[in-house]
Amino acid sequence: MRASSEASLKAAADRWEPVLAEAGESARDLAESIFAVVDALDSSASLRRALTDPARPADAKASLTQGLLGAKAPDAVVDLVAGMSRSRWSADDDLASALEEIGTTSLLAAAESRGELERVEDELFRLGRSLIGARELRIALSNRELPVENRVALVDALLEGKVAPETELLVRRAATSMRERSVPNAIAHVGELAAARRRRLVAAVTAAVPLTQGQLTRLGEILERAYGRSVQINVGIDPEVVGGLRVQVGAEVVDATVLTKLEEARRRLAG
């Protein structure tokens, strides 16, 4: 993807994270709905163009999305796709690729909510390694001329009951969506997403009033410097929160005073 599509994907993924946090294990259902949208986009060049045409008004693209999906998908997924159709995409197939990644992230979030993310990451790594030495299986899974249902049956025969359900679904997608040049490459990419998600920290922020994008960006920078890792910020609103802001990272509660001191210390060091 080019820079504009990457920026649109990141913005959509950031907006989607609070939905995943609230969904818990149900994020798996959201993922499957997103994948259904991806399949529809992949099968219709005219639909891809209609939802990504930069000359078409953003509101018109969002209305088209809402009309097409309507009651066919959860409200959260309709809102996600409508919002993404408003964004700028460098190529008409980038929207589908971005949704594929968000669907994948949703499955990983479902595994994470069950405490199984590390297991899924490990299973993906092991499977990718085993495919390197299994030429016939690798070719069969990557064969675009083989009907999709045959590739799904092959994955099920290989993995059903032996791995986490999210792992099996992710490998199914790798074998059917064929966005990467080969299934091992697709599995490796998903494994990288799983590893990145497992390494990140999540900050649950409760604010007395909604934070501006600038405030969120600054807060994220302060927390990332403090913890030395990427921090995902999920925001909730409570008018009665003490001090106007409450931040919890893991089991640690960080109040507004501590954040102020961290920022002041950073400025002194920078100066």
From Swiss-Prot:
It comes from Beutenbergia cavernae (strain ATCC BAA-8 / DSM 12333 / CCUG 43141 / JCM 11478 / NBRC 16432 / NCIMB 13614 / HKI 0122). It comes from the Bacteria. InterPro entries: ATPase_OSCP/d_CS (IPR020781), ATPase_OSCP/dsu (IPR000711). This is ATP synthase subunit delta. Keywords: ATP synthesis, Cell membrane, CF(1), Hydrogen ion transport, Ion transport, Membrane, Transport. HAMAP family: ATP_synth_delta_bact. One of its GO terms (molecular function) is proton-transporting ATP synthase activity, rotational mechanism. F-type ATPases have 2 components, F(1) - the catalytic core - and F(0) - the membrane proton channel. F(1) has five subunits: alpha(3), beta(3), gamma(1), delta(1), epsilon(1). F(0) has three main subunits: a(1), b(2) and c(10-14). The alpha and beta chains form an alternating ring which encloses part of the gamma chain. F(1) is attached to F(0) by a central stalk formed by the gamma and epsilon chains, while a peripheral stalk is formed by the delta and b chains. The keyword Cell membrane applies. It is a peripheral membrane protein. It is found in: Cell membrane.
